[in-house]
């Protein structure tokens, strides 16, 4: 191999320690991951636009270009991060039946800046004892629209869920597809283990530089320069899944922890930039944006989920005003006006 046994052992130990240090698995609960109940009689109605601090959420269909244009008001997004429904996760009351049609309709209307990045979280579907590559047609279509299939990441969700899974290993990951038309350098958000140190030298002053093809040790290209404080994340996103029990604590699907969109927002946007979320759901990306100083422009077709997103935001940021754009009235005032009681 060109390495001594001691050098190989040193490299393996360092790699193992780095993986442990860089893992973003979190054992503590995040209060922001708590989701309010879905209301039987929602306050929100189709066409409503809620101003939520620096963010906007419209109750409307992201496949409708007029809805997206109204929401964006001429603004362009630096990032689209979303987790679309798949595998009959959500009941759209027969508004959209075909998944490809849904995805093409939504992604044809992306209000992106020229260097905008599009990251989409999807999971596996098994039917008749096979993995169904349901995304294939949509991936091909994205390419015809000028969106490069730039990268493919893995979201490591932590330990597998209990169950026998019909003979399969316990699921513990999902995918994040990355599209763009222009590359944008990812932000360096991962702390470096040896920050500030000149780690290319051992204690005795000898070098740990890689050997060349002929077996000789090459020079360190950054000799005399300390290791940087942070680095670009790797392609495995290590974040624990939402801890709620689907069907018990959570009565709507595709709930992911706030830490996931927070990671993506911090990786591919700067504070103050716009993020487009076409499937707002329970408002997870809104919370991540508030936490990181980004501005979300979101659509959600179902009025009850709009209410959930608003209430969830309010329970985490009660000091941030939430008003109906058309009237300037607060969410509570609109609830009394429409339902006769506070929401």
Describe the residue ranges of each PLM region.
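S-adenosyl-L-methionine
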Residues: 46-71, 310-343
């Amino acid at each position: 191999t060109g390495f001594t046994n001691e050098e190989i052992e040193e490299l393996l130990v360092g790699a193992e320690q780095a993986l442990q240090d860089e893992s973003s698995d979190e054992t503590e609960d995040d209060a922001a991951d708590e989701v309010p109940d879905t209301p039987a009689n929602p306050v929100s109605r189709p066409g409503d636009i809620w101003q939520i601090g620096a963010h906007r959420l419209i109750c409307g269909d992201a496949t409708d270009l007029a809805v997206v244009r109204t929401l964006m008001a001429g603004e362009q997004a630096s990032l689209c991060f979303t987790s679309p429904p798949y595998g009959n996760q959500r009941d759209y009351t027969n508004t959209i039946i075909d998944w490809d049609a849904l995805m093409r309709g939504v992604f044809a209307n992306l209000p992106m800046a020229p260097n905008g990045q599009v990251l989409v979280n999807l999971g596996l579907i098994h039917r008749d004892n096979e993995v169904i590559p349901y995304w294939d047609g949509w991936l091909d279509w994205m390419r015809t629209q000028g969106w490069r299939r730039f990268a493919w990441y893995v979201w490591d969700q932590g330990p597998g869920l209990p169950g026998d899974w019909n003979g399969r290993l316990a699921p513990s990951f999902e995918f994040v597809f990355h599209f763009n038309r222009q590359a944008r350098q990812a932000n360096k958000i991962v702390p470096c283990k040896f920050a500030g140190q000149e780690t290319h030298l051992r204690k005795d002053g000898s070098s740990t530089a890689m050997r060349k093809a002929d077996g000789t040790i090459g020079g360190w290209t950054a000799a005399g320069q300390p290791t940087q404080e942070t680095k670009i994340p790797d392609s495995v996103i290590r974040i624990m899944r939402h801890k709620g029990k689907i069907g018990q604590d959570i009565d709507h699907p595709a709930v992911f922890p706030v830490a996931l969109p927070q990671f993506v927002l911090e990786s591919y946007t700067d504070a103050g930039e716009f993020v487009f979320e076409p499937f707002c759901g329970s408002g997870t990306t809104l919370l991540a944006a508030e936490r990181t100083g980004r501005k979300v422009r979101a659509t959600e077709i179902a009025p009850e989920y709009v209410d959930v997103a608003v209430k969830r935001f309010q329970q985490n940021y009660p000091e941030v005003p939430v008003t109906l754009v058309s009237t300037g009235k607060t969410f509570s005032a609109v609830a009394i006006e429409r339902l006769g009681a506070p929401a």
